[in-house]
Each structure stands twice: as structure tokens, then as C-alpha cells.
Amino acid sequence: MPRKGPAPKRPLVSDPVYGSPLVTQLINKVLVDGKKSTAERIVYGALEGARAKSGGDPVAALKKAMDNVKPSLEVRSRRVGGATYQVPVEVKPGRSTALALRWLVGYSKARREKTMTERLQNEILDASNGLGAAVKRREDTHKMAESNKAFAHYRW
């Protein structure tokens, strides 16, 4: 670990269209090979499509989707006396947001729609309605933590 301590968190700039730091994080998560304008086009297109389909505020739909995808518990491997236990731990807020965005974008890429814009739009709408693969991933994570509750005393 560095002697100076952990590096300070850099402030997140809100995106110019919606003024939301969450949209900026989503753009950065969609980003591939440094092509920021392409990532922005995909995210803004998905949010506009979500506005057209749901008829509401797309940022509100994104926030609702994030709330439905954010995990509150996860399991971490802990080695004790030659055995490896899956120990349930609470997820810090920053990590839960990062995981939720990673899952949303990852499962968007795995969908069957033609363009990434459509895939992301539909995954956001599904997640805001409590459906979709990203929400299922959160439920699986919570189920795993619940089934390993017996090892919670190994927490660190």
C-alpha cells in the first residue's frame, strides 16, 4: 500500500445533456477503445428511446433500474485452515453502483436486439420494471449470500 494513503476520489462531471453524474458513469462504462462520442451516442439514444417507450423521464427510469439492480450483499472468498468459505459481506455504496452499471451494460451486450442502443434501452426498461438479466444477477447474488449466512462470523 502506498505510504501517502489512498488516492483521492476525483469529482465526477455531470453529463451536458441530462446533468446527471449517473449518466456520465454509464457512458464511461459503455466506452470501448476510448471512443467517447460513440458511447455518448449509444447512451443518449437509449435514454431517448426509453423516454419514447415509457413516456416518462429517462433519468428517473435509469435511477429506478439502478435501485433494482444494486446489490446490498455479496460473497467474498475467505480461506480458513485449508478450507475456502464464501463469506457474505455488505456492499459499499460506490461498489454497488459500479456493479449495477457493469451488470446493466454486460447483460445489454448479451441481448438479442440489433443495435447496442436498443439493447441498452430495453435492459434499462426491463430493470426499472424489476425484470431482465441484471435484476436476476442481483437476486442470485443475494441468494448466494443468504445461503452462506452461516459463515458470516468469518467477516473481516
Swiss-Prot record:
- A UniProt-annotated Pfam family: Ribosomal_S7
GO CC aspect terms: small ribosomal subunit
Stored Gene3D superfamilies: Ribosomal protein S7 domain (1.10.455.10)
Q: Name one GO biological process term.
A: translation
Keywords attached to this Swiss-Prot or TrEMBL record, sorted alphabetically, are: Ribonucleoprotein, Ribosomal protein, RNA-binding, rRNA-binding, tRNA-binding
Q: CDD domains this protein is in?
A: uS7_Bacteria
Role played: One of the primary rRNA binding proteins, it binds directly to 16S rRNA where it nucleates assembly of the head domain of the 30S subunit. Is located at the subunit interface close to the decoding center, probably blocks exit of the E-site tRNA.
The subunit structure is:
Part of the 30S ribosomal subunit. Contacts proteins S9 and S11.
The family annotation for this protein states: Belongs to the universal ribosomal protein uS7 family.
Q: What is this protein called?
A: Small ribosomal subunit protein uS7
Name its species. Paenarthrobacter aurescens (strain TC1)
Question: Gene encoding this polypeptide?
Answer: rpsG
